[in-house]
Amino acid sequence: MKTLSKLTTALLAAGALCGGVYAASNGLDARAETRPLFNDKRPIITPQSLPGGAYDPNGDFSNDPNPKIEHLFLPWEDVDLSTLSTADEYARKRGRSLLITVEPWSWARNWRVTPADLLSGILAGHYDSNMTAICSAAAKLNTPVTIRWAQEMDEKNGQFTWAYWKADDYVKAYKHAVTVCRKSLPTAKYMWSPMGKDGLEAYYPGDSFVDVVGLSVFGYQPFDLRKLGRDSTFVEATKPGYDRVKRFKKPIVIAELGYQGNEAYVHGWAEEANKPHSEFPNLQAVVYFNDREVYPWPDGLGRPDWRVATPPLLN
């Protein structure tokens, strides 16, 4: 579970550790020659690479100079916002901006309301104080902030309450949340972040409510073999969603990237993920999701482990 307390623990632990700085040429540390190359799954970074980032509760990227974005996840209920200042200082020291995903629910599943009740509550202003609290806290931070609200609304796998809404209702709720947040946090960028599915355009809230478009891209070899009968590539997995959102003429960021498979599969994805591709001229950055999947994948494929190292790297 993506808890802010887990993040804070990781940040404090990482700050207490010491070790080699990762080489900018390939993202691997000086000890890499003593272990198999892809025990460390981090995207390979070169001077030509797109900016990278990470959601990193295990601290594997703590001493890595390559990431430029620190990704946080917050529920808008039951969250200790005082720890945002810890994350801010951690990111500032490393020259990173903050991408804050705000999920409009509680992470305690038995406390969640129905999709209809959540929607009506948002539109009636019952959750304005939740959004205001987060955005007011973010306004006090020293690092640049991007707010990503209610992500992957076009993914109909039952994971997110807001994904049950009709598209026009999602648009109303998104506009309401951003309008509330802007009152406290006018300097932030606002990210609209679909999964990348067919029909996502119906959820687009309009240019004035979107500064950057996010996408989620995952490569899971068992799923590929089940559905395609072969391995997929990063470009192949990214292209459908990219092609659907490029019409909006906004900067595009892969807000969540993950991959799991055998060594050859991981090698291919790690090598390609942050490389500039002619197919994706508007792609501005790629942010890795460094944790286990929260929900099982279909067809009994379990929960993919996107973590770049197990056990976590001690940088």
Where are these regions (language model features)?
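C-terminal region of N-terminal signal peptides and the immediate post-cleavage residues
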Residues: 19-36
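N-terminal substrate-binding region of glycoside hydrolase catalytic domains
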Residues: 33-129, 259-262, 287-288
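Substrate-binding cleft of secreted/luminal carbohydrate-active enzymes
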Residues: 36-39, 43, 146, 151, ...
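Acidic (Asp/Glu)-rich catalytic clusters
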Residues: 58-66, 82-100, 133-142, 204-208, ...
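Substrate-binding cleft of extracellular glycoside hydrolase catalytic domains
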Residues: 81, 85-189, 289, 306-311
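Glycoside hydrolase catalytic-domain groove-lining segments
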Residues: 86-103, 205-208, 215-262
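Aromatic-lined carbohydrate-recognition surfaces of secreted/lumenal glycan-active proteins
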Residues: 174, 178-200, 251-262, 288
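Distinct, well-ordered alpha-helical segments
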Residues: 196-209, 266-267
